[in-house]
Amino acid sequence: MMQYLPEIYLLLLGFTVFMYAVLDGYDLGVGILLPRNDVAQRDRMIASIGPFWDANETWLVLAVGILLIAFPTAHSLIFTELYLPTALMLIALIMRGVAFDFRAKAKADHKDHWDLCFKIGSLLAVLTQGYMIGRYVVGFESAPEAYAFAVLSALCVAAAYVYIGGAWLVLKTEGELQVRAARWSRKAGWLAALGVLSVSLVNPWVNSAVAERWFSFPEVILLAPIPIIVFATILVVDRYLKRVPTVNDAGVQWPFFGVVLIFGLSFLGLAYSFFPEIVPGIMTAQQAASSPETLMVVGIGVVIVMPTILLYTFFVYRIFKGKATDLSYL
């Protein structure tokens, strides 16, 4: 058991990052989608994420904590290489936090400025996260094609977050805003599909180890269902979004859950490409892990904290299910 602790922590880290991508992904996407010329719709969009967004970001804190304590060597390397985009991401998240609270107190003629700040912060956070994923996947190589891949990754992540953000709004809103959200999500979905296809082709090209894992026989046969299910789900989600609005909101939950499935399969493919490496092409989980004694002690905290966050997340989403209503701090 002790010898497998690094791999167990790597799986926990992957799960935590996935939860962050889904939960904070949709509220970042909603932030990007804030319309410029409709205050009422902006208010309703912000209200749709208001009860959840602080809890959603908890998963990012947990992921960084696991990386720092369980894999300190990898933590040092990753954040040394990604110092600038990490700083920009933190600035963007601070912008979002400040704008979110201040817009609730601001006078009407100042609300537009805070909404713009929230939108810019959301977009900057998404682009930096996508760029960091791209740099990480290629093992921080400095070749021009590696940086181009990181830029492609940033655009793909932005499309994916808008995709899930639009699907969330379809679930949580109604009327004209719901119809607009479905239209936004459909457009972003096809951009995300193009991005997934591009990354799936480019990643094996820039990383021979990934190409060998995916295209060797019989692995290529066993793994073929993953991309097939992803693109089939994109088609199904698009079909549901095209039907919005529906009678009695029938089926409006399925686009969001469909996009979550797409995210999950994409993460599964990424995990298969690199496991058990924690930094692709540089170090494995075993090489980067803390001592077994440290991992055992940390495990006590993880066993307490992760279920608590899961239960709290379930509780919040259970309490605030249904359509978004006005959000106020007054």
Where are these regions (language model features)?
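Long, contiguous internal "core" modules enriched in hydrophobic/ aromatic residues
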Residues: 102-248, 255, 269
